[in-house]
A protein has these predicted regions:
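An active-site-proximal structural segment forming one wall of the substrate-binding cleft
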Residues: 108-124, 143-170, 194, 230-233, ...
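Active-site cleft segment of glycoside hydrolase catalytic domains centered on the general acid/base Glu
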Residues: 138-168, 173-201, 206-208, 257-266, ...
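Aromatic-lined substrate-binding rim segments of carbohydrate-active enzymes
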Residues: 64-136, 184-205, 264-267
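Aromatic-lined carbohydrate-recognition surfaces of secreted/lumenal glycan-active proteins
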Residues: 127-148, 170-176, 188-230, 247-253, ...
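C-terminal motif of bacterial Sec signal peptides marking the signal peptidase cleavage site
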Residues: 15-16
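Acidic-and-aromatic substrate-binding clefts and catalytic sites of carbohydrate-active enzymes
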Residues: 53-67, 74, 86-93, 100-112, ...
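Substrate-binding cleft of secreted/luminal carbohydrate-active enzymes
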Residues: 82, 249-257, 276-354
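Boundary/entry segment of secreted carbohydrate-active catalytic domains
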Residues: 26-88
Length: 354
């Protein structure tokens, strides 16, 4: 019945357009007039990563004024949680962490990004999750104990220094893994357990990736995992993380669109089995382009949001708002993606006339 009514409405709108003088230059249109009868519904995004210590995304060189404006745009869109993707990567760190400076060959940072982000999260009544330090070497070389030791000391320092902020509400275990790095669960387990013990059981989150056709490894000749292999292997991995990880948010961009729903269903099934909330990590950049990386096409993002809704995801984070969805981004396409998102979900767009 709803489909019939939608079809009739679209027909009426099109007839209305046709009835007007096609040469009337004063005629204006709305995107709603051209929405298809079975346009996907999708689910909303409630969180974003903050990718300021970046792996492969260019920096926008923002100061606190620009970040303040962007937090406001996030809040206006409905985002209530921000996740620092990592405290540092290799030589670059997000704040002058004494525990890292004392043992690692890192550069002393000019800005305390952790304090800045926490103050902004406080201001806009958002939850902040602190992401761990990624050495970029120890865990890649198999020295898991060194990676664990660094992060346990960092957790103690960070909680003592920043734990008073009302927005400090969780931890992100930053090292990203797939089927090829199963031993990483040792880091997840030890670091996650310590973070929860120190902070009074604040939640922990992980965002691994699916070993699919769009991973660098598979595009270089490795074999993509099947859905059944993914379920078997991650059942084993997650069985070692029960009670340590609270939010499981698989990245959604490494598999093809026609495969994604089946993986999401498995992810939800596994999360439920081990008492975790199942989020999805909407990649708001486009892996299908020859350039790394540009904002995703709205149709692709909406398709992924609809699959996540149908699979019953408990929440959705994106990687990441500030570059790929923000009206403040250096990419003009990102602002248009923000416009389409607000328009689709009936959110007042305070940034339309930017």
């Amino acid at each position: 019945m709803n489909r019939i009514l939608s079809t009739i409405l679209v027909a009426i709108l099109l007839m209305s357009c046709a009835s007007k003088n096609s040469n009337d230059k004063s005629t204006t249109f709305t995107n709603e007039q051209f929405k298809t009868a079975e346009c996907p519904q999708g689910m909303k995004i409630n969180a974003t990563f903050l990718d300021e210590i970046s792996w492969d995304i260019p920096h926008q060189n923002w100061g606190v004024e620009e970040w303040d404006q962007d937090f406001r745009a996030m809040k206006d869109m409905g985002i209530n949680t921000v996740v620092l993707i990592r405290a540092g990567l290799g030589r670059w760190i997000a704040a002058p962490f004494e525990s890292i400076l004392a043992t690692e060959d890192v550069y002393y940072p000019p800005v305390d990004l952790v304090e800045m982000f926490l103050c902004l999260a406080d201001k806009y009544d958002m939850a902040f999750y602190f992401g761990m330090y990624d050495s970029g070497k120890y865990w890649h070389e198999g020295d898991y104990l060194k990676e664990i030791d660094l992060n346990i000391k960092l957790i103690d320092e960070v909680w003592a220094k920043y734990g008073h902020h009302k927005s400090f509400q969780g931890w992100y275990l930053s090292q990203e893994v797939s089927r090829r790095t199963k031993n990483m669960t040792k880091i997840y387990a030890e670091v996650g357990r310590h973070a929860k013990e120190v902070s009074g059981n604040l939640p922990t989150m992980v965002s691994p990736y699916i070993h699919g056709v769009k991973t660098d490894q598979v595009m270089s000749g490795d074999t993509a995992t099947t859905v059944s292999e993914h379920e078997y292997e991650w059942n084993e991995i997650l069985s070692n993380l029960e009670g340590v990880v609270d939010i499981l948010a698989f990245q959604d961009g490494q598999v093809d669109y026609h495969e994604l729903y089946d993986y999401l269903v498995v992810n939800k099934k596994l999360a439920d089995k081990y008492g975790m909330k199942c989020w999805t990590n909407f990649e708001s950049f486009d892996r299908d382009m020859p350039i790394r990386f540009l904002p995703i096409k709205w149709e692709k993002l909406l398709l992924k949001m609809e699959m996540a809704r149908k699979a019953g995801m408990d929440g959705a984070i994106t990687f990441e708002f500030s570059h790929f969805m923000s009206p403040n981004s250096e990419y003009s396409q990102a602002g248009h993606l923000y416009d389409r998102y607000c328009e689709h979900f009936g959110i007042e767009n305070k940034w339309k006339n930017r």
